[in-house]
Amino acid sequence: MFKLKYLQIAITIYVVLILALILFQRFILLHPKKLAKDYHFDFPKSEEFYVQITSDIKINALRFSTTDSVSKGAVLYFHGNADNLARWGEHATQFTERGYDVVMYDYRGFGKSNGRFDEKNFLNDAQYIFDDLSRRYNPDKIILYGRSLGCGAAIKVASENPVKKLILETPYYSLPEVVWSHLPIFPFKYVSEFKVPAHQWLPKVHCDIHVFHGTDDEVVPYNQSIKLLTTTNRNPDKTLTTLQGGHHRDLEKFKEYQAKMDELLK
């Protein structure tokens, strides 16, 4: 009887935890920070603008100009799952100093962008932003750069459009796979609101692909990149820079990262 009672308690706790995981998955995966509409971005050689997605949805974006006299093209940067452009804009210099203009934007519900984040809008907005950028640059001059969460959007856009190159920093096989790697006793992959199946899109990418990942990434495990890259062998070139001891947020500090970026953006 006692064993049965404890089993019932354990099952009840497990079910409650699963329900909590389902109900609060948005707060687990997304950590946006809003910005006041009059917030001023203070980045050099940058311009703030909005992209009107629908009559009531406006996406806030930043355009950075290269420090070189002539631009090599543009980098469309898809940022991670937290904060806003006030943080992510700091990463633009690694591209502008190497001769590229940069466009980055906040997802719905992040920064000054209005609306509610969901998977469909996340992917559709990425294509819309790419289309907007394509009016200013030929697609063969556009590099897509995905960072963590943003890797899914970058891969999806690259799978449907001709671009110069796809660069991924700490990518994932799918979002449920990432959560599963941390909580393997929970069936999150079957109940997740967010799927973002990057592994289904990567085989359709025909441009060069390069991946950066640290071996000590505590958010998106290193093996996510290994597993993702095994899904494709169709593209002209796919390479992986493994950063020994690299975590989720510190890859830019590695000389191997900087050397590879010099090569990729030459």
Located regions from the model:
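An N-terminal hydrophobic leader/cap segment in hydrolases
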Residues: 3-53
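Membrane-embedded segments
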Residues: 54-132, 152
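Short alpha-helix in the alpha/beta-hydrolase fold that links the catalytic acid
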Residues: 91, 198, 207, 221-230
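Primarily recognizes the serine-hydrolase "nucleophile elbow" in alpha/beta-hydrolase
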Residues: 132-135, 139-183
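Active-site nucleophile elbow and catalytic-triad environment of alpha/beta-hydrolase enzymes
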Residues: 187-201, 206-207
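Short beta-strand/loop motif that positions the catalytic acidic residue
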Residues: 205, 211-213, 217
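Acidic catalytic loop of the alpha/beta-hydrolase fold
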Residues: 216-220, 248-249
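C-terminal catalytic histidine-bearing segment of alpha/beta-hydrolase fold enzymes
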Residues: 227, 234-266
